[in-house]
From Swiss-Prot:
The active site is at H71. This is 3-hydroxydecanoyl-[acyl-carrier-protein] dehydratase. Belongs to the thioester dehydratase family. FabA subfamily. InterPro entries: FabA, FabA_FabZ, HotDog_dom_sf. HAMAP family: FabA (MF_00405). Keywords: Cytoplasm, Fatty acid biosynthesis, Fatty acid metabolism, Isomerase, Lipid biosynthesis, Lipid metabolism, Lyase. It catalyses: a (3R)-hydroxyacyl-[ACP] = a (2E)-enoyl-[ACP] + H2O; (3R)-hydroxydecanoyl-[ACP] = (2E)-decenoyl-[ACP] + H2O; (2E)-decenoyl-[ACP] = (3Z)-decenoyl-[ACP]. It comes from the Bacteria.
Length: 171
């Protein structure tokens, strides 16, 4: 496994998508176009809203992003599920960053609130993930609350994001 850093650039995040950052069979981000993170600006095992660790990350929005022409024609909006998936991606990344082993999977979320939209004129998305707990058992389970800001305004909030790492072999 790579040395734990406090931030990651785009190339380092892509290496996680290729399965190189945390080692084969361990936490892995999706590759573009499903990758919803361009930079991890800060990651820590302590601090955050619950003092159990946090991640702060960013995604640069482009009017040319793949989802705008199809969602919806004449009214382009980034699907809210992509922002939620970005929160799950970061929750799983945190578990791999802690050194936990296994393949990641989004499991659930308690509540999601959408208060705004990402449109082609949006420039920057910022993520905040604050960890409540990490449980280690048959699978490693991370639970966190998250938010997404579009150009500085909080537009999504999610509570009890849950991501697990399982050591089961891939199909």
């Amino acid at each position: 496994m790579a040395t734990r850093q406090s931030s990651y650039n785009y190339e380092e995040i892509l290496s996680c998508g290729r399965g190189e950052l945390f080692g084969p069979g361990n936490a892995q981000l999706p590759l573009p176009p499903m990758l919803m993170v361009h930079r991890i600006t800060e990651i820590s095992e302590t601090g955050g809203a619950f003092d159990k660790g946090f991640i702060r990350a960013e995604y640069d929005v482009s009017p040319d992003d793949w989802y705008f022409p199809c969602h919806f024609q004449g009214n382009p909006i980034m699907p809210g599920c992509l922002g939620l998936d970005g929160m799950w991606q970061l929750t799983g990344f945190f578990l791999g960053w802690l050194g936990e082993e296994g393949r990641g999977m989004a499991l659930s979320t308690g509540e999601v609130k959408f208060k705004g939209m990402v449109r082609p004129n949006t420039k920057l998305l910022q993520y905040g993930i604050d960890f409540k707990r990490v449980m280690r058992g048959r699978l490693v389970l991370g639970t966190a609350d998250g938010w997404l800001k579009a150009d500085g305004e909080t537009i999504y909030q999610a509570s009890d994001l849950r991501v697990g790492l399982s050591k089961e072999k891939a199909a």
